[in-house]
């Protein structure tokens, strides 16, 4: 039996770090929303008891470093599944980009194998399992728009922001989240107003959303990789309604309401950035249907 599953990327409309926890993780408060840029996974049941990862993308590991592999392994061990699975990952989301591509692949694997192996788990149970794999996996199981707290695994759903274009530009570098957090000095950064962002999203206030976007990690990544700051400045000059770095970077996104301006910004960015995408916000949460 074979199953196709979609794994959408996420952006952070607001990201704050409150402090470091005793377990070594950072306490965060952020708003994430899924966008229509997605990897596609094909899950095929194997009679033999093994996990196989296949991808044409050379940056996708085919062993337990891969979060989709970890998701399959977790389900096999927790529920004593004796069958195997072959997971083919068609990558569209850039790797190490701040868009939760690996986490979304893991979440899609959890949802898909729940169906393929007839495990009968609820989406809440899958999200709880996702937290054992990575901080963003719980959110990616649900999708939609949510406030994430704790280390990112505590999810509270909120309304979907008004529909708009999201233009993404990723420079030809990868950023490691641990390096960014390691250089973060909480008393030297600008903290965004996450609560205000919740209010303007719930009010459907597009201008308010654009005025309130913020990411506490931006200055850290900009200092390490000045080219990320240059992309943000360029996107602003081209006329995006709001511009922000997603996650720990290096991808920068712009929110744009009008089609004509979206095309102008997209074409302008293609002139000096290799990976540029224009996609829409995804309004709906995932279901198990």
UniProtKB/Swiss-Prot annotation:
InterPro entries: GHMP_kinase_C_dom (IPR013750), GHMP_kinase_C_sf (IPR036554), GHMP_kinase_N_dom (IPR006204), IspE (IPR004424), Ribosomal_Su5_D2-typ_SF (IPR020568), Ribsml_uS5_D2-typ_fold_subgr (IPR014721). Belongs to the GHMP kinase family. IspE subfamily. Keywords: ATP-binding, Isoprene biosynthesis, Kinase, Nucleotide-binding, Transferase. It comes from Bacillus anthracis. GO terms for biological process: isopentenyl diphosphate biosynthetic process, methylerythritol 4-phosphate pathway; terpenoid biosynthetic process. It is an enzyme of class 2 (transferase). HAMAP family: IspE. The lineage of its organism: Bacteria, Bacillati, Bacillota, Bacilli, Bacillales. The gene is ispE. This is 4-diphosphocytidyl-2-C-methyl-D-erythritol kinase. Catalyzes the phosphorylation of the position 2 hydroxy group of 4-diphosphocytidyl-2C-methyl-D-erythritol. Its EC number is 2.7.1.148. It holds the Pfam family GHMP_kinases_N. GO terms for molecular function: 4-(cytidine 5'-diphospho)-2-C-methyl-D-erythritol kinase activity; ATP binding. Pathway: Isoprenoid biosynthesis; isopentenyl diphosphate biosynthesis via DXP pathway; isopentenyl diphosphate from 1-deoxy-D-xylulose 5-phosphate: step 3/6. It catalyses: 4-CDP-2-C-methyl-D-erythritol + ATP = 4-CDP-2-C-methyl-D-erythritol 2-phosphate + ADP + H(+). ATP binds at residues 94-104. It comes from the Bacteria. The active site is at 10, 136.
């Amino acid at each position: 039996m074979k199953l196709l599953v979609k794994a959408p990327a996420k952006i952070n409309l607001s990201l704050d770090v409150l402090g470091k926890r005793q377990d070594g993780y950072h306490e965060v408060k952020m708003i994430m929303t899924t966008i229509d840029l997605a990897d596609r996974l094909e899950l095929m049941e194997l009679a033999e008891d093994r996990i196989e990862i296949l991808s044409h993308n050379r940056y996708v590991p085919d062993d337990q470093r891969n979060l989709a592999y970890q998701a399959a392994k977790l389900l096999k061990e927790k529920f004593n599944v004796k069958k195997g699975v072959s997971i083919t990952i068609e990558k569209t989301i850039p790797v190490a980009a701040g868009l939760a591509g690996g986490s979304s692949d893991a979440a899609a694997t959890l949802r898909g194998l729940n169906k393929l192996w007839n495990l009968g788990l609820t989406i809440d149970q899958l999200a709880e399992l996702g937290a054992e794999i990575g901080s963003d996996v719980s959110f990616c199981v649900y999708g939609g728009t949510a406030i994430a707290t704790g280390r990112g695994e505590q999810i509270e759903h909120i309304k979907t922001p008004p529909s708009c274009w999201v233009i993404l530009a990723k420079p030809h570098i990868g950023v490691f989240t641990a390096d960014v957090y390691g250089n973060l000095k909480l008393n030297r950064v600008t903290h965004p107003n996450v609560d205000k962002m919740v209010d303007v999203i719930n009010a459907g206030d597009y201008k308010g959303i654009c005025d309130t976007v913020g990411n506490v990690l931006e200055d850290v990544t900009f200092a390490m990789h000045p080219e990320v700051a240059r992309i943000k400045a360029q996107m602003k000059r081209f006329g995006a309604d709001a511009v922000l770095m997603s996650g720990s970077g290096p991808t920068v996104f712009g929110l744009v309401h009008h089609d004509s301006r979206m095309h102008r910004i997209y074409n302008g960015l293609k002139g000096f950035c290799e990976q540029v995408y224009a996609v829409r916000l995804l309004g709906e949460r995932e279901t198990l249907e």
